[in-house]
């Protein structure tokens, strides 16, 4: 698969802020949603960032496929939680965009898909267009993503009471 420099930059910036970072895409949207659901049910907040890319002049280039990926994860999360309560307008629009997409055709005809196909990466685009074919939930640990299933369970969250 092809790397996402902008996605990597965002992932590391979020991790540096103390957030737990999970890699999600069309291929693992359901698995990520199932992993997130109990955390959200326990009160955790979720931020889904459709990273986009950068133009050659370093300005942001939105990527519709990242919006679809965000919508796929959020749609699956809503289904897991059986509620869209608290979803932002942006989250609801991502879910709507996901509901409107026709894969793989739309991805192959999107600007990024055409660009990658023209560069000889059509097989990568076709793989990226697959939905819910992976159960891997990649969690950023240090400088690499690791499968959440292979990580030790988190310890209890302790806080100091009094002095």
Would you name each region that the model predicts?
Residues 5, 14-20, 61-163:
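Long, charged alpha-helical interface segments
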Residues 2-60:
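Internal, conserved structured core segments that host functional sites
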């Amino acid at each position: 698969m092809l790397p996402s420099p902008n996605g990597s930059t965002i992932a590391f910036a979020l991790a540096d802020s103390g957030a737990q970072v999970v890699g999600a895409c069309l291929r693992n949207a359901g698995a990520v949603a199932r992993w997130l659901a109990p955390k959200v049910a326990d009160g955790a907040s979720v931020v889904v960032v459709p990273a986009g890319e950068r133009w050659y002049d370093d300005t942001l280039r939105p990527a519709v496929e990242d919006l679809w990926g965000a919508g796929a994860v959020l749609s699956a999360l809503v289904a897991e939680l059986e509620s869209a309560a608290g979803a932002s307008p942006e989250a609801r629009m991502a879910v709507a965009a996901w509901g409107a997409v026709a894969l793989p055709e739309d991805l192959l005809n999107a600007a990024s898909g055409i660009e990658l196909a023209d560069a000889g990466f059509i097989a990568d685009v076709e793989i990226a267009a697959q939905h819910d074919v992976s159960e891997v939930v990649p969690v950023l640990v240090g400088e690499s993503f690791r499968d959440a299933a292979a990580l030790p369970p988190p310890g209890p969250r302790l806080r100091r009471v009094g002095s």
